[in-house]
Amino acid sequence: MESFKYCFDNDGKKWIIGNTLYSGNSILYKVRKNFTSSFYNYVMKIDHKSHKPLLSEIRFYISVLDPLTIDNWTRERGIKYLAIPDLYGIGETDDYMFFVIKNLGRVFAPKDTESVFEACVTMINTLEFIHSRGFTHGKIEPRNILIRNKRLSLIDYSRTNKLYKSGNSHIDYNEDMITSGNINYMCVDNHLGATVSKRGDLEMLGYCMIEWFGGKLPWKNESSIKVIKQKKEYKKFIATFFEDCFPEGNEPLELVRYIELVYTLDYSQTPNYDRLRRLFIQD
């Protein structure tokens, strides 16, 4: 793909390819719409057709994150926006497939408490929508939460999970999956090989919140075995958990209550999103 100056998506839109932003399992390029503009305002994610996570991500954008459904859902609830990117193009070459979204800015790094509270509410709203569509995100971590012009975006839908079997019964808890992701933010269920359920998404968000509020995750730089051991212990002793996350004793009570509520959820339980959200809504 490096030899191409431009490519066309399935709707015939031309995308001019710029510098590489990231190279890992997939490659991210800066792209722009035409030759007259010098600004690369979009990002193209591209991978080989044999790479299933990118195909799953494209399908998820099309079937679950459609703009009309999002617009109706937010209007009914009086929500300004969800942290879900718009899709601007999908395409393929002989060997590759790709999609295009806006350049969504930098990793969210809050500068004040007010922005943290707002981010918590926005992310709970966003996860509630994804869960209402019968899926979980499965990969909530700081590098997947971006901000541009005071607007958050949750990216990377390559590890989404379907929550329900035929007949609308919840999937069973089975520890039979190969785990993947950043072990620092991974939920306990995922560590143990279970599919991420609603409580898992909210648990991972909680670990992001701890850092947003100025705390530290006590298991960072530990081996994966030690990380899961610590997380399981901390679920039993939440007071100790927050003593280690906030050694100066400045943990927000709203955050403590959020973690307490999330830790008590059953695997297949639908959370009380309103209750979680109200913790962070400032009058």
UniProtKB/Swiss-Prot annotation:
Gene coding for it: OPG198
Span of domain Protein kinase: 1-283
Subunit structure, as described in the record: Interacts with B1/VPK1. Interacts with host VRK1. Interacts with host VRK2.
Protein name: Pseudokinase OPG198
UniProt binding sites for ATP: M1, K30
Family matches, as InterPro entries: CK1_Ser-Thr_kinase (IPR050235), Kinase-like_dom_sf (IPR011009), Prot_kinase_dom (IPR000719), Ser-Thr/Tyr_kinase_cat_dom (IPR001245)
Species name: Vaccinia virus (strain Ankara)
Subcellular location: Host nucleus
UniProt entry tagged with the keyword Zinc: no
Function: Pseudokinase that plays a role in viral DNA replication repression by activating the antiviral protein BANF1 and inhibiting the activity of host VRK1, a cellular modulator of BANF1.
GO cellular component terms attached to this protein's record: host cell nucleus
Entry annotated with the keyword Cell wall biogenesis/degradation: no
GO molecular function, one term: ATP binding
Similarity field: Belongs to the protein kinase superfamily. Ser/Thr protein kinase family. Poxviruses subfamily.
SUPFAM superfamilies per record: Protein kinase-like (PK-like) (SSF56112)
Protein keywords: ATP-binding, Early protein, Host nucleus, Kinase, Nucleotide-binding, Serine/threonine-protein kinase, Transferase
Chief location: host cell
Regulation: Both catalytically active kinases B1/VPK1 and host VRK2 repress B12 inhibitory activity in a B1/VPK1 deletion mutant strain.
